[in-house]
C-alpha cells in the first residue's frame, strides 16, 4: 500500500498531536499509512514515564506538554527534524521492538551519509555519537536523535527527532530522557553544514527502505 508523505513545515505541537491522535483513532484496515516530516516551535514534551522534575530550569518562553508517547522529557524546536510515523504495524508485519530497531538503523544510516558514526545504546532508545576521528571528545556519547512512540490498535504514532541545527541551550534545561548529565548535540555542532531539507530527504529515504522494503 502507498505511504502518504506530508512535508508540513513548522507547525504547532499541540494541534499536530491532536490531529495524529484523531487520525489513529479513526483509521481502519484500509487507511493508507502516513509519514509527516516537520519542525515545531520550541516546546518541551513529557511522556508517560516522565517526571516533571526533569525540567530542572523551566522557561516562560517554552511550554511543557504532557503527551501519551513512551519515554521521558524531551525538547522540540526549530532546526530539528521531527518525523511522525502513522503506520499500521499489523499490516506491515512489524512488532514494536522491531519498529524501534528499524527507526534507529535509518537514523544511523542517515548520519553515516554525512560522515558521522553513531550507535544505539542498550536500554536507552535513541542515537548517540560514537568515538571517531574529527569529533571533539566532549561530544562522544552525546545524544543526537530521540525516539518516542505510541501504539494503539496495532497502529503507531509519534516518532523520532533528529537534531540538525537546534537550540542546545534548551536541552540544558532538562535531563534528556530522564538521564541527568546526558549531553545532547546537533549535526551542525559536529561539523555538518548541509541544510535541513537535504538531511530530511535522506532520512526519509532511509526510513522508507527500513520500514517498507520492496
UniProtKB/Swiss-Prot annotation:
Keywords, sorted A to Z: Acyltransferase, Cytoplasm, Transferase
Localization (cell): Cytoplasm
Family annotation (InterPro entries): aa-tRNA-synth_II/BPL/LPL, BPL_LPL_catalytic, Octanoyltransferase, Octanoyltransferase_CS
Enzyme's top EC category: transferase
GO molecular function terms noted in the UniProt entry: lipoyl(octanoyl) transferase activity
Organism for this UniProt entry: Polynucleobacter asymbioticus (strain DSM 18221 / CIP 109841 / QLW-P1DMWA-1)
Marked site (Lowers pKa of active site Cys) residue numbers: 143
Family: Belongs to the LipB family.
Miscellaneous comment in the UniProt entry for this protein: In the reaction, the free carboxyl group of octanoic acid is attached via an amide linkage to the epsilon-amino group of a specific lysine residue of lipoyl domains of lipoate-dependent enzymes.
Residues noted as binding substrate in the record, renumbered to the chain: 69-76, 146-148, 159-161
CDD domains: LipB
PANTHER family: LIPOYLTRANSFERASE 2, MITOCHONDRIAL-RELATED (PTHR10993:SF7), OCTANOYLTRANSFERASE (PTHR10993)
Domain named BPL/LPL catalytic: residues: 29-214
Active site (catalytic residues): 177 (acyl-thioester intermediate)
Summary of the function given for this chain in its UniProt record: Catalyzes the transfer of endogenously produced octanoic acid from octanoyl-acyl-carrier-protein onto the lipoyl domains of lipoate-dependent enzymes. Lipoyl-ACP can also act as a substrate although octanoyl-ACP is likely to be the physiological substrate.
Biochemical pathway: Protein modification; protein lipoylation via endogenous pathway; protein N(6)-(lipoyl)lysine from octanoyl-[acyl-carrier-protein]: step 1/2
Protein name: Octanoyltransferase
Reaction(s) this enzyme catalyzes, per UniProt: octanoyl-[ACP] + L-lysyl-[protein] = N(6)-octanoyl-L-lysyl-[protein] + holo-[ACP] + H(+)
Keyword Phosphoprotein on entry: no
Main location group: cytoplasm
Keyword GTP-binding set for record: no
GO annotations of cellular component type: cytoplasm
EC number(s) given by UniProt: 2.3.1.181
A Gene Ontology biological process term: protein modification process
Amino acid at each position: 500500500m502507498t505511504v502518504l508523505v506530508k512535508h508540513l513545515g513548522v507547525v504547532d505541537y499541540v494541534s499536530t498531536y491532536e490531529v495524529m491522535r484523531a487520525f489513529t483513532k479513526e483509521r481502519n484496515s484500509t487507511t493508507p499509512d502516513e509519514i509527516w516530516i516537520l519542525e515545531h516551535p520550541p516546546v518541551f514534551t513529557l511522556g508517560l514515564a516522565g517526571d516533571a522534575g526533569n525540567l530542572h530550569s523551566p522557561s516562560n518562553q517554552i511550554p511543557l506538554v504532557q503527551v501519551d508517547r513512551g519515554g521521558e522529557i524531551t525538547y522540540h524546536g526549530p532546526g530539528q527534524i521531527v518525523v511522525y510515523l502513522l503506520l499500521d504495524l499489523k499490516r506491515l508485519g512489524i512488532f514494536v521492538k522491531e519498529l524501534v530497531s528499524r527507526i534507529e538503523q535509518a537514523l544511523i544510516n542517515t548520519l553515516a551519509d554525512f560522515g558521522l558514526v553513531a550507535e544505539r545504546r542498550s536500554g536507552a532508545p535513541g542515537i548517540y555519537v560514537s568515538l571517531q576521528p574529527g569529533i571533539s571528545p566532549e561530544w562522544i556519547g552525546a545524544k543526537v536523535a530521540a525516539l518516542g512512540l505510541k501504539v494503539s490498535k496495532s497502529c503507531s504514532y509519534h516518532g523520532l527527532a533528529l537534531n540538525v541545527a537546534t537550540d542546545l541551550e534548551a536541552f540544558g534545561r532538562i535531563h534528556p530522557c530522564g538521564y541527568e548529565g546526558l549531553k545532547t548535540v546537533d549535526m551542525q555542532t559536529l561539523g555538518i553544514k548541509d541544510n535541513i531539507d537535504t538531511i530530511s530527504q535522506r532520512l526519509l529515504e532511509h526510513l522508507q527502505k527500513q520500514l517498507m522494503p520492496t
